[in-house]
Amino acid sequence: MTATETVRVRFCPSPTGTPHVGLVRTALFNWAYARHTGGTFVFRIEDTDAQRDSEESYLALLDALRWLGLDWDEGPEVGGPYGPYRQSQRAEIYRDVLARLLAAGEAYHAFSTPEEVEARHVAAGRNPKLGYDNFDRHLTDAQRAAYLAEGRQPVVRLRMPDDDLAWNDLVRGPVTFAAGSVPDFALTRASGDPLYTLVNPCDDALMKITHVLRGEDLLPSTPRQLALHQALIRIGVAERIPKFAHLPTVLGEGTKKLSKRDPQSNLFAHRDRGFIPEGLLNYLALLGWSIADDHDLFGLDEMVAAFDVADVNSSPARFDQKKADALNAEHIRMLDVGDFTVRLRDHLDTHGHHIALDEAAFAAAAELVQTRIVVLGDAWELLKFFNDDQYVIDPKAAAKELGPDGAAVLDAALAALTSATDWTAPLIEAALKDALIEGLALKPRKAFSPIRVAATGTTVSPPLFESLELLGRDRSMQRLRAARQLVGHA
């Protein structure tokens, strides 16, 4: 690649299932590298498997990238010079490339059945599970005609080179597969439909992809891709072989790869809990890369400025939910309070949680919990006491704080608040401190815990005086009186 050529990377998932955090990590690294280099981020859908692919999963991929803010320069709903960007719409392109590969002798029709291949291995004293033996390379025209007359439907296989296949992996360094270690591989099904082994490198060539950043699990397929790229160059379809970078595996518990069965692998499960994009992307960036040894908290702009694929670590990265949560909490605290309020309202609305406060009061309540939550979903437990239909005194909290000692506290609090001239947090605080700390000589925890339980139903809530102000005089007094009845007469 010359200095004048632009980096072109691609993210090309198959639309199956729910977006996996490992998949999103791959998208993030590709996106960040494109933005860092001033290059192009191509989003391509590999939907050639009609039995597994679904429109629902396709739409989920679009939703995931949009929620995360990973915008694409070319791809679905955006277009671009090398479209279409869904492989299911590129069948004619693949048929043309196949015809050219066959005409040039780079590929051939293979008629052998798996049983025939295995039988030949056994007859030759080889391991029967070695895979295809390149037998059909040397068929005569008469043999091919005979197979066709039998009604056999051939697959198309690429003729692998007789040389070593090697590349300098941008993450792992030099990698070599010895000549003969990779057999001729199928480019099509017997039906003639193209396989991933054809369409993926073919699209990379036609879309002029310069760098392929993908998961380590795909490294064994790289020799086949190199060989096909070489053939595509020889027939005039490709201009270059892209540079490869194989990103480290994301692990779950122990040493096992994070699988779709692991709850933390589901991107939308994190969103449903209340992760914000900034927090999740920050954590995913750390799965194989770091901005600095002592600097784990950063935003996308910082990542883009610093990211180079050459700095990606080759060692597996373990998904640590606690660390992800901690980073998300930090990013929530960093949000402008107005921005946080909007996001919190949207999250609660999405999950059917309505807080019985007007807009101004909700904004004030949001500010109270912003530094007290890890994910947006935590706010519901802290704020639901504002809803009369959700308010209930927790029995454990009542047993702890609304015992005999609580009666005197509630009596004094009710007396002090009844005579309060204004219902604001500073005046509420002053009245209660005067009555309970000065008047009853109580320590703050003993003074205010019974009031907290009475007003909110729990021992954990937003700041007490501000909560009472937002709850309002009437509802606050009603709840304190009801709690006093629970305590009984002192």
Swiss-Prot record:
GO terms for molecular function: ATP binding; glutamate-tRNA ligase activity; tRNA binding; zinc ion binding. The keyword Transferase does not apply. Keywords: Aminoacyl-tRNA synthetase, ATP-binding, Cytoplasm, Ligase, Nucleotide-binding, Protein biosynthesis. The keyword Ribosomal protein does not apply. It is found in: Cytoplasm. CDD domains: GluRS_core. One of its GO terms (biological process) is glutamyl-tRNA aminoacylation. A motif ('KMSKS' region) lies at residues 257-261. ATP binds at K260. It catalyses: tRNA(Glu) + L-glutamate + ATP = L-glutamyl-tRNA(Glu) + AMP + diphosphate. A motif ('HIGH' region) lies at residues 13-23. GO terms for cellular component: cytosol. Its EC number is 6.1.1.17. InterPro entries: aa-tRNA-synth_I_cd-bd, aa-tRNA-synth_I_codon-bd_sub2, aa_tRNA-synth_I_cd-bd_sf, Glu-tRNA-ligase_bac/mito, Glu-tRNA-synth_I_codon-bd_sub1, Glu/Gln-tRNA-synth, Glu/Gln-tRNA-synth_Ib_cat-dom, Glu_tRNA_lig_a-bdl. It holds the Pfam family tRNA-synt_1c. Catalyzes the attachment of glutamate to tRNA(Glu) in a two-step reaction: glutamate is first activated by ATP to form Glu-AMP and then transferred to the acceptor end of tRNA(Glu). Monomer. Belongs to the class-I aminoacyl-tRNA synthetase family. Glutamate--tRNA ligase type 1 subfamily. This is Glutamate--tRNA ligase. It comes from Mycobacterium bovis (strain BCG / Pasteur 1173P2). The lineage of its organism: Bacteria, Bacillati, Actinomycetota, Actinomycetes, Mycobacteriales. The gene is gltX.
